[in-house]
Amino acid sequence: MSNRKYFGTDGIRGRVGDAPITPEFVLKLGWAAGKVLARHGSRKIIIGKDTRISGYMLESALEAGLSAAGLSASFTGPMPTPAVAYLTRTFRAEAGIVISASHNPFYDNGIKFFSIDGTKLPDEVEEAIEAEMEKELTCVDSSELGKASRIVDAAGRYIEFCKGTFPNELSLSHLKIVVDCANGATYHIAPNVFRELGAKVIAIGCEPDGLNINEEVGATDVRALQARVLAEKADLGIAFDGDGDRVIMVDHEGNKVDGDQILYIIAREGLRQGQLRGGAVGTLMSNMGLELALKQLGIPFARAKVGDRYVLEKLQEKGWRIGAENSGHVILLDKTTTGDGIVASLQVVAAMVRNHMNLHDLCSGMKMFPQILVNVRFTAGKGDPLENENVKAVMAEVEAALGNRGRVLLRKSGTEPLIRVMVEGEEEAQVTEFAHRIADAVKAA
């Protein structure tokens, strides 16, 4: 990934109005992508977006660029990222494009691509698009220009797909669920999925205004969800992020249930049902408690680099079907091709109904180790903090103190100028002190 100029671990992302997220760049990106994708056959592209106000501007720019390259665009309107992957597959489009910055604030946005089979674009295609960006934009002949259309039943198609991943013999009629859509792309999808399966749904974070996506709601801030679950005496709460590829849950006591715990529940249920193929994939950030709990069940566990594309690569390498990040990206390859918050949450709720257990009890077989994450902003060009000798020395001291009862991880964010410092161990006070000691060394580097 290091030789890329524009593409990061999750497409192209940045602040709207600053390079590269400008109308001029996105128009050129649409054209370059069109030139590359036109070589492959079909000339139709699916374009979806989340609820950010900048989505209107950027989809227009993308459509202009694609049209200039001779490709037609079909718009879904606000639609979860996994829905665009699904629709790309079912419409047999050449590619799908999502305009979203996922869990980031409204003033950020991004562009990510899906291939014809609903997976992230291969590295070589992204590199070919970057190479095309360096060329001068030329427009095809007027008779060859692409057209624009709208997919009017996109939401209904995806709702039916999601419901189809929930077992027919089960019903949610006895459950009260608070659903938090982060004022994002799932706002008109997720509440309907759970209602149509019989649940009593209380919806929050379902009033997008273009500016309030992920603002004190959704998977990255579950405080409003926790409060509402307790106030409503609900059975559980489910929070999605702005583009619906992440899910975090809340049990009836208001406790947060993260991606590691969701992976544990789904893996254990797969084992019970005789449907688990191989093991489960987590990441370098996955809690040690997950690894130990799966080991006790005899379920193999492997760690991938952080990023859902790396979880997917590890699953494909191992021939396994389920993987997740603790942030709530859950990939279930027997159901879909990419992280899907709604589909993942349905599998957890199915386990609750089938086993007549609440979410709190489903998690009880896994003891979470205290894990402290500190984000340190750094300035590009000042040198690599991860190569600093003092940082290395402090990290070595902490690792020696933890021994085999904990872990230390330092890594750069794939989407922001941040160093993420993670320390995990048995004692929360000790882990917190160690994390801040390393973070201070990174700041001073």
Swiss-Prot record:
Enzyme group, top EC level? isomerase
Its UniProt entry gives the catalysed reaction(s) as: alpha-D-glucosamine 1-phosphate = D-glucosamine 6-phosphate
Q: Which keywords does UniProt give here? A: Isomerase, Magnesium, Metal-binding, Phosphoprotein
Keyword Isomerase belongs to the record:
yes
Q: Which residues form the active site?
A: 102 (phosphoserine intermediate)
For activity, the cofactor(s) needed are: Mg(2+)
Q: Which GO terms describe its molecular function?
A: magnesium ion binding; phosphoglucosamine mutase activity; phosphomannomutase activity
Bound cofactor: record note: Binds 1 Mg(2+) ion per subunit.
Q: Which CDD domains match?
A: GlmM
Any one Gene Ontology biological process term? carbohydrate metabolic process
EC number of this enzyme: 5.4.2.10
| Binding-site list for Mg(2+) | 102, 241, 243, 245
Output the Pfam families linked to this UniProt entry: PGM_PMM_I (PF02878), PGM_PMM_II (PF02879), PGM_PMM_III (PF02880), PGM_PMM_IV (PF00408)
Q: How is it modified after translation?
A: Activated by phosphorylation.
InterPro entries attached here? A-D-PHexomutase_a/b/a-I (IPR005844), A-D-PHexomutase_a/b/a-I/II/III (IPR016055), A-D-PHexomutase_a/b/a-II (IPR005845), A-D-PHexomutase_a/b/a-III (IPR005846), A-D-PHexomutase_C (IPR005843), A-D-PHexomutase_C_sf (IPR036900), A-D-PHexomutase_CS (IPR016066), Alpha-D-phosphohexomutase_SF (IPR005841)
Q: Which residues carry this modification: Phosphoserine?
A: 102
This protein's record includes keyword Plastid: no
Family that this chain belongs to: Belongs to the phosphohexose mutase family.
Record's function text? Catalyzes the conversion of glucosamine-6-phosphate to glucosamine-1-phosphate.
What protein name applies here? Phosphoglucosamine mutase
Query: Which species does the entry assign this protein to?
Result: Enterobacter sp. (strain 638)
Organism lineage: Bacteria, Pseudomonadati, Pseudomonadota, Gammaproteobacteria, Enterobacterales
Gene that specifies this protein: glmM
